[in-house]
Design a protein with these regions (language model features):
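Short, acidic Ser/Thr/Gly-rich low-complexity loop/linker segments typical of extracellular
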Residues: 60-71, 141-152
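Structured interaction patches on ligand/partner-binding surfaces of diverse proteins
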Residues: 66, 87-119, 168-200
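A short, amphipathic beta-strand motif
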Residues: 40-48, 123-127, 167
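Bacterial Sec-dependent N-terminal signal peptides
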Residues: 2-6, 23-47
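Bacterial N-terminal signal peptides that target proteins for export
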Residues: 2-20
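Short domain-boundary/entry signatures in modular proteins, especially
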Residues: 33-41, 115-124, 200
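Short, ordered, surface-exposed loop/turn motifs in non-cytosolic proteins
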Residues: 49-62, 130-142
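Short Pro-Gly-centered beta-turn/loop motif in secreted/extracellular proteins
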Residues: 69-87, 92, 152-168, 173
Length: 200
């Protein structure tokens, strides 16, 4: 069996090493190279998180964040070219968290995602004159349906400190008309319980 090529009789050893090194580099490139060129790290900063209970998702993997944490990095790399959306899937019991710079397409490592958390408060008030069912009130996507005879209400979802709220009647009770007083404002440092709903 003959060799694919024949070295000259005086082929310099140094030149031979260069040829072999080049061949090895080509072979390694053909095997795929480093995985870091096809996947990116997704990370960011957290401001104001004091309580446990925050979970973040990027559409590919999730990470549980402990109270007091100021940075995060998703453990699984995001495939190059894949779209990502960072958002909270669970929140601390007494905080709400919002995400800035949380979406995009993975073209390089991302470390600019910002998660901001603030205290959250209950939103509710009093009801007078409600004698029938089917009353539905909303605050954005937050919904509450007081039963006939109810004298107070609290929305199931808490509202973040500094966030605006606007309570409206989505559905009137049977044969009654309800109006909302003090239903618009901004959440301060305590729960809101001054909203009045009068039904006639």
């Amino acid at each position: 069996m003959s060799l694919p090529f024949t070295l000259p009789r005086r082929f310099p050893a140094r030149r031979l090493m260069r040829v072999l090194a080049a061949g090895m580099a080509i072979a390694l490139a053909g095997c795929g190279g480093s995985s870091t060129t096809t996947n990116i790290l997704l990370s960011g900063n957290i401001v104001g998180l004091t309580d446990a209970g925050l979970t973040l998702s990027n559409g590919i993997s999730s990470i549980v964040i402990g109270g007091g944490t100021t940075t995060f990095t998703f453990p699984n790399r995001t495939p190059l070219g894949a779209a990502y959306v960072v958002q909270p899937t669970t929140l601390p019991a007494a905080q709400v968290c919002t995400v800035t710079n949380g979406s995009g397409v993975a073209v390089k490592d991302v470390n600019t995602v910002l998660v901001t958390c603030v205290p959250s408060h209950m939103l509710g008030g009093t009801i007078t004159g409600l004698s029938s069912g089917n009353l539905v009130m909303v605050n954005g996507g937050n919904v509450v349906s007081p039963v006939a005879g109810a004298q107070s209400f609290v929305f199931p979802g808490r509202v973040g400190q500094g966030f605006a709220y606007g309570v409206t009647v989505l559905n009137q009770p049977l044969q009654q008309n309800c109006t909302v007083i003090n239903g618009v404002g901004t959440v301060g440092v305590s729960d809101i319980n001054s909203i009045q709903v009068n039904c006639t």
